[in-house]
């Protein structure tokens, strides 16, 4: 139970740190500090990934990788009415974002909240409110500020290219279920920290050297595209696919 509590605490902590692909420095800093507290050395790559080193009994090295970056959005343009047009970071299922809360993160790290909405948001006004296709081209972001023009938004410091983080809605139920956006793959990162905690707490020295790689660009296609040559074997820890004729369920661990 204590280990479960630790893993859930790590999960809640990193879920609270917004990290769409390309904006992962803060969550990597958290992971780095946690690894140091457990007594492990780390290294940041030029790409921004974090490597955590565990000494083993021989020279063979096994790598584990999980990604801490998530899907997200980005300001495409500021519209004349003070709302934001957006594009996607990675491949979010855009229709599910209608009505979701979000944060706009400026270059100066000022954070503004907002809501992702359809361009026909009110059933009482728009005849196509129910039927309009939800896509980046037919949706916008309403900022939680009094803004009525492009100039009003620019005065806030919001620019094209600013990151937009989607509310994770993280919930841990009394029955033990975890509901959240971006469990892919922050849940796996939390589990790997549970492994590190066990190794540290029980003073276990594994047979082989271990390198845990926390990657930062998986959702845009090149998370661990480079693996250091000293790693002989790599185990990727990520979410499994469920549905159609696939044999797995939410209660399984899939080994590929």
Give names to the regions the model predicted.
Residues 1-256:
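N-terminal hydrophobic/helix-forming segments and targeting peptides
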